[in-house]
Amino acid sequence: GLGSLVYPPMLLLAPVLLFSLAVSLRALSGSSFLALLFGLLLPYWLLLGVGVWFDDVQTEFAPYIEAFQFQKPDYSALSLPQIVTMAYVTLLAFVAMIHFARVAYNDKIRTRMYFYVFILFELVIMGALAMQPQKSDVLLRLYIVNSTPLIAHHFTLGRGRWANIWFGLCLLLLIGVLAFNMGYGKLF
């Protein structure tokens, strides 16, 4: 709701959240559906009030209407630091998803349910990055934030000598990615 005022296509994640509440978390009830609907509509209802107050509703909602006009994917809009960061996070996210699929039985049922939601959002954001790379400034941040619990779960539950070596290698790669991004200019 409120985040979609800053980045309107974030509203497209609402059906994914609704699906997750209904199927993965089994927590969708009438009151939670109304709360979701109210949370999505309240910021726009307040924005409508501002538009009516200033007698210019069309100007208030014009940026939000333009945000949903999708363009063809423009991969030239991606900078080299963004590509390097995306590649690093994608590598870690895929390894973490595979690790979770292999050792999910060790987690409690509720934890598994939450991680299935994280994985679903991960795949949706990956698809959004592939379809709209010109909007990667916001999508990459969402991608990193959503990937963090999966990657942390992987590093926390990884056991053995190879897991320790992999963690050290990932740490060195992270330092390399950060140094590259700092030397190249800016991260985003």
Model-derived features: where do they sit?
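Membrane-interface alpha helices of multi-pass inner-membrane proteins
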Residues: 1-8
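Perimembrane helix-loop-helix junctions
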Residues: 13-41
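Membrane-lumen/periplasm interface segments of specific transmembrane helices
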Residues: 32-69
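Juxtamembrane membrane-water interface segments that cap and precede transmembrane helices
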Residues: 61-83, 96-100
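Membrane-interface helix-loop-helix junctions at transmembrane boundaries of multi-pass membrane enzymes
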Residues: 96-121
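Membrane-interface catalytic loops of GT-C/OST-like multi-pass glycosylation enzymes that act
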Residues: 129-141, 159-163
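Hydrophobic/aromatic-rich transmembrane helices and adjacent perimembrane loops
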Residues: 136-154
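Juxtamembrane boundary at the C-terminal end of a transmembrane helix
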Residues: 177-188
